[in-house]
Amino acid sequence: MSQIHTRLEVMSELAKNMDTYVKDYLVPIETNWQPADMLPDATKDSFFADVKALQEAANELPYDYWAVLVGDTITEEALPTYESWLLGMDTVNHIDQNDGWARWIRTWTAEENRHGNLLGTYLYLSGKVDMKAVAVSTQYLIADGFDIGTSADPYRNFVYTSFQELATNISHRRTASLAKQHGNSLLSRMCAQIAADELRHHKAYRAFVSEIFNLDPNEMMLAFADMMKKKIVMPAHFLREINGAKSSLFEHFSDAAQRLGVYTTQDYVTIMRGLISDWNIENMTGLNETAEKARDYVANLPARLEKLADRVKVPELAYPFSWIA
């Protein structure tokens, strides 16, 4: 296909395939799972016994696990930030109900919305969490927004989502495994279901970038390199507790994830290597001089970051989160 050189043309070209994208990467609402499928049913006589069993299983989970689970939940609950960010992309007409990209974003958001609902209800029922403290951190995170370096550029936005959806998949997948190791099959199932959603979403955004590379390889390469230079910032990087400064809590949350092995600096490098391979960056030809330099920069970056990852030291002592009762 001939190369297209404007964002509007490229995004319009991709939007022609929106029916296929929605069919391949999102699940029809009628057949999708819902939080109620996994939570105790308050209409049943067994409700109180089921909640008691849930709480007994929750008692077996270690402190850092709760810190990570709450942080993951708050991240999911900050969905309004992510939806408004995507709807604010250049080339997206969110007023037009027939706009292909607005349709994708709304349908993706509808799937993502279940994650925070499920985890938040589990936290409430567990009896292990100060839900007011969690709600305060959630409200702060939504009010503070985020600063991830993409501006309103769809190319940079899709690099970010390709990376971040896979990082989220890894985190939820490993919390599922750890819950299972501690005998909590219910929570393991919840986290695994969320992880599966995140993997589908990752594959979608990865496919969008692949298509953009076919249509506008020079500009897409520059966008990829720019995001790698800036580093992918986690969406909860402004995390804080009541009366805390913006971003004051994120490092403690990240340290807990590192101690558990849920998401590590090595995972960051592994994801980058995977995207470089998936998009065939090292073998891409026909680029202009500037894009070639960007390609070479990206191709050499994982080896450099690997050395830094090996030197990362994580504090051994857990931080006293206000979230955990």
What are these regions (language model features)?
Residues M1-A325:
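Non-heme di-metal
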